[in-house]
């Protein structure tokens, strides 16, 4: 005769095998689908990175080309005539240096920064510092446009 322990062992073994079989029917297909989605994530990430690198290369080349064109255009423009300030000289004050620096260089190429020797005086008025900076930069670059 079979003991109770052996009987329950075979019952539990049968339940374990049956549950394992039915769970593998769900786990293996879901694992395959998960693998397919993981491949998709990696491939789309690669494509995204490559398209970003190509767009970055196009942007850098276009930016360099436009900078060259802008430099050529800046060299071909005529320097603007120096205008006399509308306000009396008593309202003018030095910007940063108490001594008068060298006058503006008429043949200078436009640069990103305005140095101390490029700016002689600025009028004391209610204009903002940004507007005065734009006027100085526009006059220095030789533009014929008036910013006001």
Swiss-Prot record:
Residues bearing the modification Phosphoserine: 102
Record's keyword annotation contains Endoplasmic reticulum: yes
A GO MF label: protein-containing complex binding
Residue ranges that the UniProt entry lists as topological domain Cytoplasmic: 1-7, 51-148
Keywords: Endoplasmic reticulum, Lipid droplet, Membrane, Phosphoprotein, Sporulation, Transmembrane, Transmembrane helix
Pfam families for the chain: Osw5
Membrane-side (Lumenal) residue stretches: 29
Disordered: annotated span: 83-110
Subunit (UniProt): Interacts specifically with the seipin complex FLD1-LDB16. Only a fraction appears to associate with the seipin core components, suggesting that it may be an ancillary subunit of the complex. Found to interact with many mitochondrial and peroxisomal proteins.
Protein name: Lipid droplet organization protein LDO16
Native species: Saccharomyces cerevisiae (strain ATCC 204508 / S288c) (Baker's yeast)
């Amino acid at each position: 005769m079979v003991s109770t322990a052996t009987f329950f062992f075979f019952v539990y073994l049968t339940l374990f095998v049956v549950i394992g079989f039915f769970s593998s029917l769900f786990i293996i297909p879901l694992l395959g689908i998960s693998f397919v989605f993981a491949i998709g994530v990696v491939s789309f990430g690669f494509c995204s990175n490559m398209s970003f690198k190509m767009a970055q290369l196009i942007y850098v080349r276009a930016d360099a080309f436009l900078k060259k064109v802008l430099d050529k255009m800046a060299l071909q423009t005529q320097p603007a005539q120096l205008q006399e300030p509308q306000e009396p000289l008593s309202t003018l004050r030095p910007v940063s240096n108490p001594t008068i620096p060298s006058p503006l260089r008429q043949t200078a190429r436009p640069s990103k920064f305005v140095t101390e020797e490029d700016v002689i005086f600025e009028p004391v008025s209610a204009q903002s510092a940004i507007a005065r900076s734009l006027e100085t930069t526009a006059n220095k670059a030789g533009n014929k446009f008036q910013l006001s």
